[in-house]
């Protein structure tokens, strides 16, 4: 509502950014609210499963490089 009260010159860039971001943010809030309201217990494991595959590749790559370098130095 604050953007609407601002003069058009100042509000135009803010409104454009808000219009672009608002639909995505609103959808994310709605989906998050639905997930938390319907099944909060199921939402946490799902988040962990999603995060695990993303973190594991990076974690695997770094240790492998370190392990390869260590024996060569020794």
UniProtKB/Swiss-Prot annotation:
Q: Which UniProt keywords apply?
A: Chromosome, DNA-binding, Nucleus
Ribonucleoprotein keyword on record: no
The residue ranges flagged as biased composition, category Basic residues, are: 11-74
What one GO molecular function would you report for this record?
structural constituent of chromatin
Query: Which stretches does the entry tag as region Disordered?
Result: 1-74
Major location (coarse): nucleus
- State its location(s): Nucleus; Chromosome
Any one biological process term the GO annotation gives = nucleosome assembly
A GO CC annotation recorded here is: nucleosome
Q: What's this protein's name?
A: Histone H1.C8/H1.M1
Q: Name the source organism.
A: Trypanosoma cruzi
């Amino acid at each position: 509502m604050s953007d609407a009260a601002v003069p058009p010159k100042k509000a135009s860039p803010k409104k454009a950014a808000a219009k672009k971001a608002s639909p995505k943010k609103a959808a994310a809030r709605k989906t998050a609210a639905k997930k938390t309201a319907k099944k909060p217990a199921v939402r946490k494991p799902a988040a962990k499963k999603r995060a695990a595959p993303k973190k594991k590749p990076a974690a695997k790559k770094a240790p492998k490089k370190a392990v390869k370098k260590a024996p060569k130095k020794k």
